[in-house]
Regions:
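Acidic/polar-rich alpha-helix caps and helix-coil junctions
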Residues: 1-256
Length: 256
């Protein structure tokens, strides 16, 4: 949780002696509660999270992963890896989704934006946001009411993302973060967007966590030059040179 799903400062109260409370009047993107377990919000069909669901909130915070955790119904049917549920680290036999239509559409949006078709790119983004706003995609309480103040809307055509390439690409990248959170995509996105971008995102994450989690107090920042592994020397040799005698692969400066 680094503030991306909401527009106001977090007011979550954390205290190991009490149940954490959220101010659910703050508008949040509905995808937050599909990706992150929050106190006071139904956790799939397991009910409301309790304080003891998090072993040490002061050390790790009060939020929990959600997308790849099996539901109670899946657990009871044996789909969740029933043989491995005992102990402090339950196992799961649930499949991991490697590629989805959502992922493909947002990758396509990136391609369109890079080729200059900003309207086409934002149409893909708006498709994703329109789906996120559907009632079926809203986490609800037992009585059928929304579990929080959910808000997500399409980008209007007057938005700068429809006319400014940099703004458009920024919007697409944000949408990937919101839509694909906790699905194992993030590192690969940061890697292909470049070392400088990755370093900036990691710094923003650490700076935010330092406000709440003591273990981040002494955290240092990863320089952009160290966000990527060096290219294997043998791979550079195997690729050979082009017609002008220049190598197809070149070792990045920090690793030469």
């Amino acid at each position: 949780m680094n503030g991306e799903y909401r527009t106001k400062k977090s007011v979550t109260v954390k205290d190991e002696a009490t149940v954490s409370q959220n101010d659910n009047s703050i508008a949040v993107d509905p995808r937050l509660d599909f990706a992150v377990g929050r106190m006071g919000i139904p956790y799939k069909d397991w009910g409301l999270p309790k304080t003891d669901w998090v072993r040490n909130p002061v050390n790790g915070g009060v939020f929990m992963p959600k997308k790849h955790v099996f539901s109670k119904a899946e657990f009871e049917s044996g789909m969740g890896g029933k043989a491995y549920h005992d102990g402090w680290a339950p196992g799961s036999a649930m499949n991991i989704q490697y590629l989805s239509v959502r992922d493909a559409k947002l990758l396509y949006a990136e391609c369109l934006a890079n080729d200059g078709d900003l309207a086409g790119a934002m149409a893909q983004v708006n498709d994703i946001r329109r789906r996120a706003a559907l009632d079926v995609n809203i986490v609800k309480n037992a009585d059928g009411t929304p579990a929080a103040n959910y808000k997500v809307a399409e980008y209007p055509t007057s938005h700068a993302a429809f006319s400014n390439k940099d703004v458009c690409i920024k919007a697409i990248r944000m949408e990937r973060k919101l839509e694909l959170a906790m699905e194992g995509q993030r590192w690969f996105d940061l890697a292909r967007w470049g070392g400088d971008y990755m370093a900036a995102e990691l710094k923003a994450y650490v700076d935010y966590e330092k406000q709440y989690i003591p273990k981040f107090a002494g955290a240092t920042y990863l320089p952009a030059s160290k966000t990527m592994f060096p290219v294997p020397d043998q791979q550079i040799l195997d690729m050979g040179n082009d017609e002008s005698g220049q190598p197809y692969l070149v070792q990045p400066g920090p690793w030469k």
